[in-house]
Amino acid sequence: MSLVIQPLLMRALNPNLSSILISGRGFSLIQHRRFAFRAGSGNNNSEQNQVHINTAPIEFTANLLAGKNETEAETEGLKGTALKALRCNDTTSDSEPQHNMENLPFKVKLVDKGQRKQIKESKARVEPRPEVSLKKTYIEPYLQLSKPRLTVLVMLSAICSYALSPYPATVLQLLSLTVGTTLCSASANAINMGREPDFDRQMIRTQARPVVRGIVSPNQAFKFATAAGTLGTSILWLGVNPTVAFLGFSNIALYAWLYTSLKRKHIINTWVGALVGAIPPLMGWAASSPLSHPGAWCLAGLLYAWQFPHFNTLSHNIRNEYKNAGYVMTAWKNPKLNARVALRYSLLMFPLCFGLSYFNVTDWYYQLDSAFVNAWMSLWAFKFYFQQKRNYSKEIYNNKTEFNKGLAMANVYARRTFWVSVLHLPAVLILAILHKKDRWDWLFEDKKQLSA
């Protein structure tokens, strides 16, 4: 086989080699093979005329070339270079001469000894496995699964209600209420995310959630929710009282199952979701005081009413995303009703804050302070409502240019109302704590004693 391939290879490498192969050793070799075939057996003449075949390793090409003429040396050099490239043999010595490879029909990239050593070492080297970050793998995904900002808001509303209750508080009770409420809220939020990855994937606001990104599977979310809910309810039962534990479990069921299911069926889901926000103040109050006190229901009503200007203005600016994702929201089903409800519950804040003073939860100065904060949010809610009412009048609605201008203004008013609501709730609750009934009596008692 090699007797046929090597002459063809040499002819392809250099046209001048064809005459050499025919006139030289190659021609005598062909004649000898032909004569041996005709004779049918070997004899002394064939042994004398037989041409010696070079079987030396290619490493000794330099030795074989010694003593040959220039043409034969060039031929053997090209032949050795070609065979060297075809054999892919990298065990060459550094003293081997460099051959001219311009006539080769393929490109040969020479690799020196140092480079070959680096390649071998890189192949033998075992790359270390990347370190698994505990924070990025476990802590951050499950922290996002609990919706930390919403959970903190729920926890603070329960703590503020606990601080406003008339009965004394204990450190153990406060810690149990804080941890238990946080875990119950995290459980409800995890179930909500585990049930809605396909819908959340269609909204920009929720595309970064861990279940949507595949960092946490729905089953893992449900397992986390089960563990957090069980632990949170147990802490509330043992560290606070059974009433608070029942309210915590009810909050999980309302948010994770009823509210989440209604989001794709009816606009009443917003009212059900507002009930979820009203339960944490009841939990805080029930931790140390009976729920028969009207002050508990005033605080719950305050949190319930606050949900509408906050959420309705938020959903207004992303109404198309809700619609495309299949969520049935008032913002796109009935835009006028959406703005009207936001204003209605903003105005409801005034009598609810009045009720806190009337039922001796706060002093009467609270009416003045809270009125400024409530008026601030009601003003922007009124602007949002009035603009939407004007937008959907017959004159403006049928004029596309005017309607688009009016809708742009409504978007601005909705965004302002939303951010005002974010500041409104902590302001109202902090003012209520500062104006708690009999909080500052110790200052006046000292003055009375000094005057007496």
From Swiss-Prot:
It holds the Pfam family UbiA. This is Protoheme IX farnesyltransferase, mitochondrial. PANTHER family: PROTOHEME IX FARNESYLTRANSFERASE, MITOCHONDRIAL. One of its GO terms (cellular component) is mitochondrial membrane. The lineage of its organism: Eukaryota, Fungi, Dikarya, Ascomycota, Saccharomycotina. PROSITE patterns: UBIA. It is a multi-pass membrane protein. Belongs to the UbiA prenyltransferase family. The keyword Membrane applies. The chain crosses the membrane at residues 152-172, 235-255, 267-287, 291-311, 341-361, 364-386, 417-437. Keywords: Heme biosynthesis, Membrane, Mitochondrion, Transferase, Transit peptide, Transmembrane, Transmembrane helix.
